[in-house]
Amino acid sequence: RGYRPLTHTAPLKETLAAGLVLLSMWRYDNGEVLLDPMCGTGTIAVEAALIASETAPGLNRGFAAEKWSDGYLKAFMAAREEAMDRRRVLPARKPEMILGSDIDPSSISAAMKNSESAGVSKLIGYSVRDALSYDPTAIRSATESDKVLIITNPPYGERMLDADKASALFSGLGEKWLWSGSVIPGLRLSIIAPKDNFENDFGGFADKRRKLYNGKIQCNMYHYFKSGRKQK
């Protein structure tokens, strides 16, 4: 989309990140904080901010059509101007409604630069933090909200974590975010992960699953939103 000059080993595609936000039914104005605790270079957070501000995809990049004849150029510029007029100017707030954190300081540095490039840096708060530190108390403290949506793309696959390490990570996250197999009250989860064994490792069955591919890796998007439900 033209805003992401900096990436890490296995970056999430911008279009997929935007899809995850939309499929999670998150709205900036409903008071629910969006948190990505393994944000990498910030793609999910940036796409959420672009959606919240109603920024048209590709608005910040150049296109070959801009070099065409005057007739095409006028139509293109008119469309760009219309998109600019529709963009919402959202007030900066503390804490931010969109939060990203990662254990890797260099990833957070890149995420901040990407957010600046996308023009949404005032809408996103970043921190260096281990995702496994986010127990219910820490989530409330970090977000200052009793409604939180966690959307994240944890490391997995050959380029990131081997199967045993990924399994241990998923298990650790489930211990923090689930209670008796169901999501803790006030929290919703949307996690993209390989379809094999995630729910067993995580410690609870998802309330909804969506099949998708992250690059060449067949995954599911696991949605957890029902609290107080007994584990199957």
Predicted segments — roles?
Residues 49-53, 114-115, 141, 164-167, ...:
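Short, glycine/charged-enriched secondary-structure capping and boundary segments
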Residues 134-146:
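Short amphipathic alpha-helix with an adjacent loop that forms part of the alpha/beta core around
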Residues 145-153:
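Short SAM/SAH-binding signature in class I
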Residues 12-136:
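Conserved S-adenosyl-L-methionine
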Residues 1-5:
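Non-catalytic substrate-recognition/targeting regions of SAM-dependent transferases
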Residues 55, 59-86, 144, 156-190:
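SAM-dependent methyltransferase catalytic-core segment centered on the flexible catalytic loop
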Residues 93-97, 101-110, 158-232:
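Conserved Class I SAM-dependent methyltransferase catalytic core
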